[in-house]
Amino acid sequence: MPIQILPARLANQIAAGEVVERPASVVKELVENSIDAGATRIDIDIEKGGSKLIRIRDNGSGIPKDELTLALSRHATSKITSLDDLEAIVSLGFRGEALASISSVSRLTLTSRTVAQEEAWSAYAEGREMNVKLKPAAHPIGTTIDVVDLFFNTPARRKFLRADKTEFTHIDELLKRIALSRLDVTINLRHNGKMVRQYRAAQTKPQIEKRLAAVCGANFLQHALEVELEHGELKFHGWISSPEGARAQGDIQYCYVNGRMMKDKLINHAIRQGYESSLPANQYAAYILFIEINPHDVDVNVHPAKHEVRFHQARLVHDFIYQAIFGALQQGASLSNVVCNDQPLVEEQVIENKESYFPPMKEYVRQPQQSHYPKSEQLRVAVESTPSYPNKAPLDSWIPKSSTGNSSSKPSALPRSFHNNDKPAEKALSNYNELLTTQSRVQRESSSQVNEQSLTFSTTQQIERVAPQVTHVSKNDITLGKVLSVVESTFALLQQGKQLQLLNLRYAEFVKTYGQLSSVNVEPLKPQPLLIPLSVGIDESICNNLSNYASLLKSLGIDLKVKNRTNIIVMAVCQPIRQQNLQQLIPNLLRYLEQINPSLEQVIKWLSHQIQHDEVSYTTAQAIQLVMELEQLWGGKLNDFYPKLLKDIDITQVIQAFSHE
């Protein structure tokens, strides 16, 4: 059979296989189009579960007459025009496939009117020939789309539809998700002429609470904790259920990224980690959560139904969500204890109108300064209390590298569990403070008496339960000096007293990595499991001798499993090499071990030279960060690297030249 271009109808029907899975898929695409058009009211009419009729009417901006035909064409959209638009997408739709795909498997009528038009126009298309017919119509400003006889021309797809009740249930659940994502939009749903759902637009807090109760039930609202956390361009807010409001099934779990419905594995894992110590295995958390992130830092074009995204800083997002959830639950538990002790029970209060009564939600605001412990110890607590999981983000990735922290608070007497000579770097702890900054000083002062004792107890209890990761740091009895600027992209200009020096930043990266790996001489490096184990091909002879290197690899935190005679699976690696191209690094390492049979020290130096760094040019902030890490890792031993690491700059002749002019 020769290669040929597919007919437009067939191409659209193939695309419809991904876009139009069932009637709920049609509703999703069309309602999202209405929201993108700025609609504040959307009416949905369904007949026979959507197989007979799906009608979506909105009061959005409408579609001009000369664009109606184009709107039913494939890859036609008003939402993006270039790759830059795609990488910074803020609309729900952007592919331009929905209307063309839907019209190819149904009888579709698109009626619309804009503010600039005196009359509306209607476009009709059928699945067979895709010929679009235009005619005038009576219609207010906005758009109405009628989808009749879904899958009428694809019987194989139609027979896979479930009962009308089942299909409508999917539509109902979909609209619940949309109603929660856009509280400012009124949504009405009818089935077979009967009004089923009315979600009125909500602006005030009481209106929002009523809408939440209408979607999730009053029981969720009664046990809801309001959570809000912000870090730079990353924002996290919403409602989570307290452990008392846990459910027997995960039917109230809604998550949104930049307003887009998500069922993302990374997000779900972070939420489960946050609830891990609060819920038994047979119960499920309930939550409505919103994540707002710079569109450039997330790729939404990775899933056919856009249910998953790819974060550019996945570990940062994961840890951020975990800390917000875990902190809210801890704070909520503290408030609950006080309420139970000091306030009368709800049953004792007089409620005149039980139908409209919803108990106010507990509001959570992180307040680290209320602890008895100094700020640096509070930060250490937050880091150490985070449980281990695959690819857990390092502390430094939480904060901008340019941030610094100078704490003037003096250490106070600490419980036994706080005393540890092998503590993480003080600089890193002070940097971490940015995530724990209280949003309101007034809120902090007004509730300090309530939270001080309970927060101290819960924090101490968590530290005693989770063993902290030990980080060995050399005594810092030498300093490289102050970083003034970056010269020629890869050198840092330092000032040590009156002496100026030039630091080779690329060689400094090697020294840092060498120091991190050399800590294996004190204790084995901690393996960090890969989120997805990596299969790597190697020579059969190396695979047969893999057991000879097991002890050395284990001490370096590298966990390998034999898959077959020519393949191994990388299960975990240590932190210094986890960002590397393991597909190349691991086979090269095994070949090096096979050919040279090196000592541990030789392997450490070899690995340090192999590790590549992405920085083509360094910023001053990155140089400062690197200098501080070198000082903490090596201390006085930095002298051993001076010939290649650091060189003095003699400006005497330059100064003398000025004096002779």
UniProtKB/Swiss-Prot annotation:
GO terms for cellular component: mismatch repair complex. One of its GO terms (molecular function) is mismatched DNA binding. Residues 400-412 have a biased composition (Low complexity). Keywords: DNA damage, DNA repair. PROSITE patterns: DNA_MISMATCH_REPAIR_1. One of its GO terms (biological process) is mismatch repair. Residues 367-424 are annotated as: Disordered. Pfam families: DNA_mis_repair, HATPase_c_3, MutL_C. It comes from the Bacteria. Belongs to the DNA mismatch repair MutL/HexB family. This protein is involved in the repair of mismatches in DNA. It is required for dam-dependent methyl-directed DNA mismatch repair. May act as a 'molecular matchmaker', a protein that promotes the formation of a stable complex between two or more DNA-binding proteins in an ATP-dependent manner without itself being part of a final effector complex. This is DNA mismatch repair protein MutL. The lineage of its organism: Bacteria, Pseudomonadati, Pseudomonadota, Gammaproteobacteria, Vibrionales. The gene is mutL.
